[in-house]
Amino acid sequence: MLEKFVEEHKEETIELVKRLTSIPAPSHHEDEKAAFVLEWLKKQGADSAFIDEVKNVQFAYGCTEDKDMVVYMAHLDVVFPDTEPFVVNEKDGKLFAPGIKDDNADLANMLMCIKYLLTYKPELSVGLLFVANSCEEGLGNLKGSKKIYDMYKGRIREMISFDGNLDRIVNKAVGSLRYRVTVKTEGGHSYNAFGNKNAIYELSRIICDLYQVKLPTKAKTTYNVGHIEGGTSVNTIAESASMLYEFRSEDKYCLRIMEVAFENIIEKYLREDLDIKVEVLGARPCGSGVDEEELQALTQKHVEIIQKFTDREVCINSGSTDANTFLSHGIPSVVIGTVIGGGTHTRAEWIEKDTLVPGQKIGLASVLSYVCGEK
């Protein structure tokens, strides 16, 4: 029945992917796409679906107070700031458009899983909460997934996110801290005020020190200055300069080591009477307290599901995803993909159209693993 449903709804899925992809949805501005998803769900019979205060679209299936809950998520937002509709182009069996792989194709497959449940109404051993969530990308800071945890904490047994390629599973959380650092000085005319402190130079000193920090070795840890700006003109001593800085790790203790190193460097320059402003732009948690046997069981279940419908070798690794929120609270969580594509976060992003079929079978098999009596 599963495979028959997917094959029969192949064209509907493709059209849904195209429609979702066409709707712009920068982080924090998912309103239009959320409204479309809610309307689509209502048309399928999901009368209880609703949009919450942070723009998540939620639909609970079989959720009662006496049952544990498993959360399924696929995110609404994309990295692109556009507010005009995107155009989906097709060539050589591929669909091209910004955001089509991350995460519109996976979102479409999750919605089709809901359609299956509403069509056949199977009895479940757990409640399933489906969430088309907001703010997964960048400085969205996992606002959508954090809201779901806060609303249902104590009831969530597992979490599965549809996000990425179908031959990849993420089961470890890469945490991060992101900052904007702004340095201000008196500046002045490059000739007449020569000798005054230059904000660009002072900021560059801070950057050089940050790049000399000795990395912890307990887990992979990285850092990056990804953007700098400042100054006025070639003949002006810069009075303001700023940078965006982040560090990442799979381990919370490594993150703390990097945080302390950052704070110490800033303090060093504050003692030189520099005017420095530090803003925390984002914080994503690492995993903490997850039962390894339960996580391995959830991971292995999905490895077997993927291998049932594809001949691809499954890669298991870490990432910064909606699963971070749940892994940080000890909830076994995995991220699986339901499509093959590439060019993620570029305007040449693409998916292989035919992989939506095995991808949807993978997603649906995951969902149906919670049906009473199913294996």
Outline where the language-model segments fall.
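Acidic/histidine-rich catalytic neighborhood of metal-dependent amide-processing enzymes
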Residues: 99, 104, 108-174, 246, ...
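Short beta-strand segments
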Residues: 73-74, 131-133, 159-163, 182-184, ...
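Acidic/His- and Gly-rich active-site-bordering loop/insert found
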Residues: 1-98, 118
